[in-house]
Amino acid sequence: MNVRLKRAKELMGYAVQLTKDEGLPTMVKRGAGFVRRRFFGKRARYLPGKKVLEAQTAEMVGKTAENCGLPTISILTPLYNTPENYLREFLGSFVNQTAPNGQLCLADASDDAHPEVERVVREYQWKNQRIVYKKVENKGIAANTNAAETLATGEYLALADHDDVLAPHAMYAMGKAVLQLREKGEPDSFLYSDEALFTKDIKKPMVGHFKPDYAPDYLLCCNYICHLAVFKRALYEQLGGERPECDGSQDHDLFLRLIEQTGGAAHLPQVLYYWRVHAGSTSGGTGAKPYVAAAAKKALTDHLSRTGRTGTVEDGLFPSTYRVKWDIEGDPKVSILIPNKDHADDLEKCLYSIWSKTEWDNFEVIVIENNSTDPATFAYYKDAEKRYEGLKVVTWPEKGFNFSAINNFGRKAAQGEYLLLLNNDVEVRNGDWLTELLRQCAHPGGAAICGAMLYYPDETLQHAGVVTGLGGYAGHSHKYKKAGGSGYLFRAATVQDFSAVTGACLLVRASVWDEVKGLDEKFAVAFNDVDFCLRVRDKGYRIVWTPYAQLTHYESKSRGGDEKDPVKAARFAAEQQRLYDVHGKADILDDPYYNPSLTHDREDFSESGDLRNLKEGKVTVRWRNA
């Protein structure tokens, strides 16, 4: 089916379902937002509405940092030859905060040719005595940040660059977020928000950076946290502040060291920081600052050493990204489970690619025969078992098709420490695909499940992880995107934390499979992989996806389409409802590795049509452990 037509059908299906669930007015409102965003450009400001900001200001009238009820946040900012217009905009964004719980700590290392930096700061100090300043020798950004910290009196610290802009509600929202965490009994030691890029006017941002909740594997591949990060001052001092030897990636290094102590982080999905894009800024890419990559690899290598893990840190697929090649513990055996009904030509393509390309040699393949009718299929099985050492065919004794039951049956014949669910209509592309899947799981602290990059034959993406809530239930990250792209915030080009991955290629520790009792056989065809991953996640295990294990997926040739068959359509609807019944509709629609400012209508990480959560300024913060 044509990709555009397929997208249109998916969108129409979601509109129909949304109308049923929430009514026509809601569907029309979201549809209007989608059309406005899609066809009339991105004019979203990401700011709360005027009345929301006015209400915050009114709440704080007559209050000071000491009696406003919010924790004080000291913002650390090194200054160096800052252009006057940028500096004024930055200082103005602090002065015009809706709450008084901020302190701005400035360490100025500007040279003698730029006396206007101090002059401008002194001017703004008359407007707000919460701005503190000291002149320092230029010892680099980390050392200068540490110098700014000596001025801090707040319980919390934040980091801001001298040429950026704070959202007007940044201090208010972060202060409220800390209180909310305390009310919930969750850790309040490290928080971060979303951000946006801009060039001249924050009311006309280029793009929003809408981040997932804390994602440890993603953080090892790039500093997705960036701004605005807030953390306890006592913890910063305990760690000795920022490390000058990591200048260029000092914040990434700091965040890794903080999380080693906190065990996680809290995410507030509000745009609280505007990152200016100009020549020389890291927001424009590390091409402007080549030393960043070396500093980042040092930060990551040191992090592995401190946490007792072994692996090699390499450059990633794109600048600003990195790859950890984990050392695999032992020589684990992998049992590859492949359900099959007829289509011997597809199966042969799959098996041949496994044996001809796979570099990891400790594996077995179990083909699970289910209700084939073509005599040639059974002749093929006998021939294949002779040609492929380590292949065995087992026969599922039931009738019909039940993906879950078939794989549960196949697991009984498996002897490996790891199980790999694999469709019969996939073809291996790179030799270390299985090694890479094992790298993500078979090391101390590794994930329980790892999924692969799957391509359609036309070189577009079929699977780069699963996001729950897309289309109302679940969808594939970056589906239909052209191969070779980085995706949204590098999310199609770096190892990622996800709530689920597709069962078309899914590696799982056998012990974890057994712990959750395998696949739920009430999900005969759809959502069995999503349900399985969610049950594993709920046990406290991690699910990741890697772009370095690549296969081509000739999707669902064996089963054919379900769209026009009323029996299959009814079964699909029942499985959709069961997904809600088992896991809760609210949780399905609130994937922690997605973001409420991103659309549920498409699989491309585009912005939501209405951005209600931003306009209403809702403070909903969530802590997530490593």
Residue ranges and their predicted role:
Residues 2, 6-68, 289-331, 458, ...:
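C-terminal, non-catalytic tails of nucleotide-sugar-dependent glycosyltransferases
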Residues 31, 35-288, 302:
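Nucleotide-sugar donor-binding/catalytic module of glycosyltransferases
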Residues 92-101, 352-362:
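Short, acidic, metal-binding catalytic loop of nucleotide-sugar glycosyltransferases
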Residues 136-152, 396-414:
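Glycine-rich, basic loop-to-helix element that forms the pyrophosphate-binding segment
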Residues 154-165, 416-429:
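Short beta-strand-to-loop acidic/aromatic patch adjacent to the donor-nucleotide binding site
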Residues 169-206, 426-473:
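Conserved donor NDP-sugar-binding/catalytic core segment of glycosyltransferases
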Residues 235, 245-271, 300, 433-438, ...:
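A short, conserved alpha-helix in the catalytic core of glycosyltransferases
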Residues 269-286, 316-322, 521, 541, ...:
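Active-site donor/metal-binding and catalytic loop motifs
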